[in-house]
């Protein structure tokens, strides 16, 4: 990769992005389902916990901040609890400023997902789709336009980006010399005419143009149709999932960018990361092609993340330099980093499992245990004893492999999603911190003797005893290696 892409993210910290669009509160309600309602043939969810996140245009702004830029968010909320929750979350982001219009007659858009295990049972939307106060929105937009470098219009068809607001915002940005990126929702792409770049996904492009199918030629045809629909639109970037991206710049041949993900764990939030990266790159003078190439790298990073939907400038620099050669590195985290990852998993309703051990000289017994552990959950955390902890448990000659090597080997296994080192004699503190849904140990234990089983069972979790492979142990391996050779 050339130096241009590697240098761009370092300049993000001085860039400011104005995000105008539909701001939402995403709420997740988790619980257990173990019976059907006697009133109707529907499941009964016993609610256990709730989490909330910035959604819609708010998530684009959060991605800008995560990449090192500053975001100014313009949208509308109601005078209600959901609106106040959104404001509080924004206030906690130091690089995110808001100019939200509070409309007492309007409900804050709120999406509530009811989740049991790894299954979404129901989504309930509270929203007003009527037109928001365009005059107030444009006043807030124009008040901040001069201080920013680029504009993102995040359209979720909730009444903020009406045709009138779109035309006025694009015209004002053009007059001020600010690039405009559109993440569209309307099937009528002509309403985004005059923007610098439009970023539909494959489905949105097909619905807007009528061009359907797969492959590079189809994507190029769809991109050309988009530019024909909006004669003053400079470029179209169609995101195509595993097929990568297709960029069409007016007057130039289309360019197909293959997907860069080393491994795909979670695609949630990838579109917002792409929009934020495009905005920051264009703000720093990148060409549409270089901006798209960098956004493609960012998409590859974010879908390889475990339960998170943001990337950092440092990660982009490393990948652009070709330094991100080992995807296993992303699976090794300290406790704080791991807790953030696990929170992301839980926000998506994934069942979290935990097991632990020294894992010195990995053997088939270890692999079998880890495979059984992963089969019992959606995401598996492995607590790994540090070198000092192993030495206290096993004696001064252990471990054979240092903790860095042991962690890397574990992280390279597909069954393992996260590796966290611990220095104590037992993983009890990790178990209390992570609160796994499933705790797994070998069948040489009983449920009662598994460390942390009382904690997990007390909050309704499950303890699984994995079957062992006979004769497989690190101690036996070391003994055989140290035994004198027989014969000549």
Curated annotation (Swiss-Prot):
Molecular function via GO: ATP binding; heptose 7-phosphate kinase activity; heptose-1-phosphate adenylyltransferase activity; phosphotransferase activity, alcohol group as acceptor
Region annotated Ribokinase, chain positions: 1-327
Enzyme class at the top of the EC tree: transferase
Entry annotated with the keyword Transferase: yes
A Gene Ontology BP annotation from the UniProt entry: ADP-L-glycero-beta-D-manno-heptose biosynthetic process
GO CC annotation terms, alphabetical: cytosol
Sites where the protein binds ATP: 201-204
Pfam (any one): CTP_transf_like
Annotated catalysed reactions: D-glycero-beta-D-manno-heptose 7-phosphate + ATP = D-glycero-beta-D-manno-heptose 1,7-bisphosphate + ADP + H(+); D-glycero-beta-D-manno-heptose 1-phosphate + ATP + H(+) = ADP-D-glycero-beta-D-manno-heptose + diphosphate
Name of the protein in its database record: Bifunctional protein HldE
